[in-house]
């Protein structure tokens, strides 16, 4: 097992830095069926009170967003279109910023169980989207409020991307200037990026 990411790592960085720096890290979920895991290849940063695209815009505090005001490394799960999405809180208590995990590259030894969790989906379809990866990993709303440092979900050091690309976030229309923030970060060339074009897929994406 590689070195696990600590709370101190989260506390030493901004939300945007974290969204970039966790690319290539291994996301692990310990389940009754064993360890399910993959390398993070796509994230989005959400900047809280000043970000119209964030659930916590203007410090909106509801039953759903309450956990966003918790400490760094807390897990924020929410449902959208029958899918469950995974986010990590990034800033000190009271500053509701987060990272959405949008895609992972599944680890080979976990693919069989992850394929079962995805009802037979294989190839890039296995984990090339935020709802797909949570289903593949067996994550659910029951993981809301856990932390990455004392639960069955954690991050490990793994690989470093050759190139990271920053683009507009997906699915945030009509959010004023926030619609155009370049806060989506991807490992350039990864076939598992959501909506990836075939002619954009590259080999040798890791250092």
Curated annotation (Swiss-Prot):
GO molecular function: alkylbase DNA N-glycosylase activity; DNA binding
Annotated Gene3D superfamilies: Methylpurine-DNA glycosylase (MPG) (3.10.300.10)
EC number(s) stated in the UniProt entry for this protein: 3.2.2.-
Keywords, in A-Z order: DNA damage, DNA repair, Hydrolase
Record carries keyword DNA repair: yes
GO-annotated biological processes: base-excision repair
SUPFAM superfamilies attached to this UniProt entry: FMT C-terminal domain-like (SSF50486)
Enzyme class: hydrolase
This protein's record includes keyword tRNA-binding: no
PANTHER family per the UniProt record, alphabetical: DNA-3-METHYLADENINE GLYCOSYLASE
Similarity section: Belongs to the DNA glycosylase MPG family.
Protein name: Putative 3-methyladenine DNA glycosylase
């Amino acid at each position: 097992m590689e070195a696990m990411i600590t709370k101190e790592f989260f506390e030493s960085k901004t939300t945007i830095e974290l969204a970039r720096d966790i690319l290539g890290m291994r996301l692990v979920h310990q389940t009754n069926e064993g360890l399910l895991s993959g390398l993070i290849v796509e994230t989005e940063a959400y900047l809280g009170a000043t970000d119209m695209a964030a659930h916590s815009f203007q410090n909106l505090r509801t039953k759903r967003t309450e956990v966003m005001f918790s400490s760094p490394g807390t897990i924020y799960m929410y449902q959208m279109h029958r899918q469950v999405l995974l986010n990590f809180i990034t800033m000190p208590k009271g500053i509701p910023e987060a990272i959405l995990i949008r895609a992972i590259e599944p680890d080979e030894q976990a693919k069989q169980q992850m394929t079962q969790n995805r009802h037979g989906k294989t190839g890039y379809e296995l984990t090339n989207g935020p709802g797909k990866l949570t289903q593949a990993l067996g994550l659910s709303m029951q993981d809301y409020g856990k932390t990455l440092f004392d639960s069955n979900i954690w991050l490990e050091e793994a690989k470093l991307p050759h190139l990271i690309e920053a683009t507009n976030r997906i699915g945030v229309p009509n959010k004023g200037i926030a619609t155009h923030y370049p806060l989506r970060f991807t490992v350039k060339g990864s076939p598992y990026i959501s909506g990836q074009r075939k002619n954009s897929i590259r080999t040798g994406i890791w250092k």
